[in-house]
C-alpha cells in the first residue's frame, strides 16, 4: 500500500491535509490518474521510500505528578460560579428526527460567550440522557457556518433515534470561536495548555446549562470525542467527574505535545469508564498511540474496552459502531 494525500471534491474539507492508505494502483474517481513530468528521473526516488511517522514516546518518559504537585496544578482548572446568562438564539423544528436549538452562554473567562447547539429527539417524554460531543480537527481549521452544523455529518443520528440528546458546544478555538489570526504550529503547541483550561471551563458551563433544563438528565451525561476530540480529551475526563462514561472514536495519544500538555502525566488518575473504537490501518492515529492511551489510564480493566476495525481513520464500520456505542451507554446509564 501507499499513502494518498488530499481528498476528492465530495469528501470532507479536512482531508485536504490528511493522508489515507490506498493501493498504489488505485485509480478511483476520487483519486483520478495523476501524472508528472520529471526533469530528472532520480527525483522520483523518494516517493518509493518508506514514510517515517513519529512514534509515541515510551511510557517511561512520563513521570506522574505527586499528589502535592497535582493539587497545585489543578487550581488552574478550577471552575467558576459566574452566571450563564443564557440566551436562546433560535429553535428549528424542521428536521424529522430532532429539534435544534442554538443557545448563547457566558464562558466565565475573558468576557467571552459560547454557543451551545442542542439536538433533542422529537416526541421524547421525560428527561433525555445527554451526549456531549467534541468533533474532529476540521472544526478547528475549516469549519462550516455554525448554523449548518448537525450530527448527521458523523452519522450520530443513531444517538437521537435512541432517545439521547446531543449537545455540541462551540469549544474554544472551533467553529465561530476560531482565533482571528492563524497560529503557527509552534504557537499552537505553546497555546495548548491554555486551550485545555478553556475547554474545562466550557465543559463546566455546558453541565451548568444541562442542569438548568428540566427535560435533560444531568445524571446521565456521556462524553463523545471523535478524532481530535478523542486525542486531546485527557483533561476533560480528569477534571469533570460527572461524565458517566466516554466514547472515543479513532482516538489515542499524540506524541507531538509537551508532557505537561499532552495529558499522559495525568492518565493514571483517570477512572472514567470508556469505549475506544479505532482503525487497524489508521495512519493518523496508529495502533501504538491508541494502546498508549488505553494502557495508561487508571480505569479498571472491566470498565474499559478497545476495538480495532479493518478500516482507516474514518469512517468506522457503521453497524458495529452503533452496536458497541449503544451497548456501552446502556451499561453505564443509571
What are these regions (language model features)?
Residues 115-116, 126-138:
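Short beta-strand element of the alpha/beta-hydrolase
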Residues 2-53:
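Disulfide-stabilized, aromatic/cysteine-rich ligand-recognition loop
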Residues 77-126:
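N-terminal cap/lid segment of alpha/beta-hydrolase-fold proteins
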Residues 270, 276-278, 282:
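Short beta-strand/loop motif that positions the catalytic acidic residue
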Residues 41, 299-334:
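C-terminal catalytic histidine-bearing segment of alpha/beta-hydrolase fold enzymes
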Residues 137-201:
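Cap/lid segment of the alpha/beta-hydrolase catalytic domain
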Residues 126, 184-227:
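Gly/Ser-rich "nucleophile elbow"/oxyanion-hole loop immediately N-terminal to the catalytic nucleophile
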Residues 280-285, 314-315:
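Acidic catalytic loop of the alpha/beta-hydrolase fold
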